[in-house]
Swiss-Prot record:
<comment type="function">
    <text>Forms part of the ribosomal stalk, playing a central role in the interaction of the ribosome with GTP-bound translation factors.</text>
</comment>
<dbReference type="GO" id="GO:0015934">
    <property type="term" value="C:large ribosomal subunit"/>
</dbReference>
<dbReference type="InterPro" id="IPR022973">
    <property type="entry name" value="Ribosomal_uL10_bac"/>
</dbReference>
<keyword id="KW-0689">Ribosomal protein</keyword>
<comment type="similarity">
    <text>Belongs to the universal ribosomal protein uL10 family.</text>
</comment>
<keyword id="KW-0687">Ribonucleoprotein</keyword>
<protein>
    <recommendedName>
        <fullName>Large ribosomal subunit protein uL10</fullName>
    </recommendedName>
</protein>
<comment type="subunit">
    <text>Part of the ribosomal stalk of the 50S ribosomal subunit. The N-terminus interacts with L11 and the large rRNA to form the base of the stalk. The C-terminus forms an elongated spine to which L12 dimers bind in a sequential fashion forming a multimeric L10(L12)X complex.</text>
</comment>
<dbReference type="GO" id="GO:0070180">
    <property type="term" value="F:large ribosomal subunit rRNA binding"/>
</dbReference>
<dbReference type="GO" id="GO:0003735">
    <property type="term" value="F:structural constituent of ribosome"/>
</dbReference>
<dbReference type="InterPro" id="IPR047865">
    <property type="entry name" value="Ribosomal_uL10_bac_type"/>
</dbReference>
<keyword id="KW-0694">RNA-binding</keyword>
<dbReference type="InterPro" id="IPR002363">
    <property type="entry name" value="Ribosomal_uL10_CS_bac"/>
</dbReference>
<dbReference type="InterPro" id="IPR001790">
    <property type="entry name" value="Ribosomal_uL10"/>
</dbReference>
<keyword id="KW-0699">rRNA-binding</keyword>
<dbReference type="GO" id="GO:0006412">
    <property type="term" value="P:translation"/>
</dbReference>
<dbReference type="Pfam" id="PF00466">
    <property type="entry name" value="Ribosomal_L10"/>
</dbReference>
């Protein structure tokens, strides 16, 4: 189904808005994927906050023109699905994870702002922890000394109470 000029302008505007907020874009060739597989991929992407879209490559080129993702336009050939994410690793994780279980989805390239990634770069990006995971690790590291200090402070009255209970038990037994 072909789009008229107004529809194309709307699509370009929508994708340009997503690209303007994006921290990463990953493209993959989806040749041979059935509808059920694409539906599962879309559901996974939606849950991860990844904007996933099949676009004509010329429309995608226009959407990334003049942005930090412009170097990606050289890679736009063939039937591609675009994963656009505000988190630098989410799109790579979703598409690389799906590509592991479904060999018909082939990751072609990816891009961080002003940085083009090849297939291996996207797979390496997918293995990195997300921002939320890094923040939770940092928070755990920051809380550990405080929690240990609180447990140590709590141990003094606990030992005292155990000592009193032992004296009470001795006197009760005598």
């Amino acid at each position: 189904m072909s789009l008229n000029r107004q529809e194309k302008a709307v699509v370009i505007e929508e994708v340009s808005a997503a690209v303007a907020k994006a921290q990463s874009i990953v493209i993959a060739e989806y040749r041979g994927l059935d509808v059920a597989s694409v539906t599962v991929l879309r559901k996974t992407a939606r849950e991860s906050g990844v904007y996933l879209r099949v676009l004509k490559n010329t429309l995608a080129r226009r959407a990334v023109a003049g942005t930090a993702f412009e170097p990606l336009s050289e890679q736009l050939t063939g039937p591609l699905i675009y994963g656009i994410s505000e988190d630098p690793v989410s799109a790579a994780k979703v598409l690389a994870g799906f590509a592991k279980s479904n060999d018909k989805l082939v990751i072609k390239a990816g891009s961080l702002p002003n940085n083009l990634l090849n297939q291996e770069g996207v797979k390496a990006l997918a293995t990195m922890p997300s921002r939320e995971e890094l923040l939770s690790k940092l928070l755990g590291t920051m809380q550990a000394p405080i929690a240990q200090f609180v447990r140590t402070l709590n141990e003094v009255p606990t030992k005292f109470a155990r000592g009193l209970a032992a004296v009470r038990d001795q006197k009760a037994a005598a």
